[in-house]
């Protein structure tokens, strides 16, 4: 078998090199431009050990326990952005304690956001009059189910909201939303 001399082996020409360089540059710029778009569609995950989502206030700022407790009195139920971006009530249980559970503010009847009525000490849906007690248990229809729960934890002063998979303490049943 004869071997081809090294001078006869075709090399990469200038045109092929420039085409490869242009393709690589355009691909790099396109991927760089698409990265923020891809991140927009992927839900954020928190670094919390519970695998939850970092709670955010109405401006999108991360909620810290010390900041929240300094501006919300005991017994307060105020909204944060929780799982899947749903509004979730954080419950202040004491001068220095956020409750271990949060209440999803989406009505189980037609999906309206249910405001907390502190005077009546219950959640009252403005759409069709459903009412829920202070723990989110339905007490008056037409809503068929209690409000969903979420676990709330504090790690390094950051507040995390995660999926509720335990028994619903209000009914003693498996959670309907899990």
Swiss-Prot record:
Complex and partners: The 4 large subunits of the cytochrome b6-f complex are cytochrome b6, subunit IV (17 kDa polypeptide, PetD), cytochrome f and the Rieske protein, while the 4 small subunits are PetG, PetL, PetM and PetN. The complex functions as a dimer.
Intrachain disulfide bonds: 112-127
Recorded GO MF terms: 2 iron, 2 sulfur cluster binding; electron transporter, transferring electrons within cytochrome b6/f complex of photosystem II activity; metal ion binding; monooxygenase activity; oxidoreductase activity, acting on paired donors, with incorporation or reduction of molecular oxygen; plastoquinol--plastocyanin reductase activity
Family per record: Belongs to the Rieske iron-sulfur protein family.
Topology class, membrane: Single-pass membrane protein
Pfam family, one: Rieske
Cellular localization per UniProt: Cellular thylakoid membrane
HAMAP family registered for this protein in UniProt: Cytb6_f_Rieske
Cofactor note: Binds 1 [2Fe-2S] cluster per subunit.
Binding positions for [2Fe-2S] cluster per the UniProt entry: 107, 109, 125, 128
GO terms for cellular component: plasma membrane-derived thylakoid membrane
TM helices/strands, residue ranges: 20-42
Known role: Component of the cytochrome b6-f complex, which mediates electron transfer between photosystem II (PSII) and photosystem I (PSI), cyclic electron flow around PSI, and state transitions.
EC number per UniProt: 7.1.1.6
SUPFAM superfamilies tied to this protein: ISP domain
Extra remark: The Rieske iron-sulfur protein is a high potential 2Fe-2S protein.
Keywords from the UniProt entry: 2Fe-2S, Disulfide bond, Electron transport, Iron, Iron-sulfur, Membrane, Metal-binding, Thylakoid, Translocase, Transmembrane, Transmembrane helix, Transport
Name listed for the protein in its UniProt record: Cytochrome b6-f complex iron-sulfur subunit
Cross-referenced InterPro entries: Cyt_b6_f_Rieske (IPR023960), Rieske_2Fe-2S (IPR017941), Rieske_2Fe-2S_sf (IPR036922), Rieske_Fe-S_prot (IPR014349), Rieske_Fe-S_prot_C (IPR005805), TAT_signal (IPR006311)
Annotated catalysed reactions: 2 oxidized [plastocyanin] + a plastoquinol + 2 H(+)(in) = 2 reduced [plastocyanin] + a plastoquinone + 4 H(+)(out)
Organism the protein comes from: Synechococcus sp. (strain CC9902)
Residues annotated as signal peptide: none
Residues in Rieske domain copies: 65-161
Listed GO biological process terms: photosynthesis
Cofactor(s) in the UniProt record: [2Fe-2S] cluster
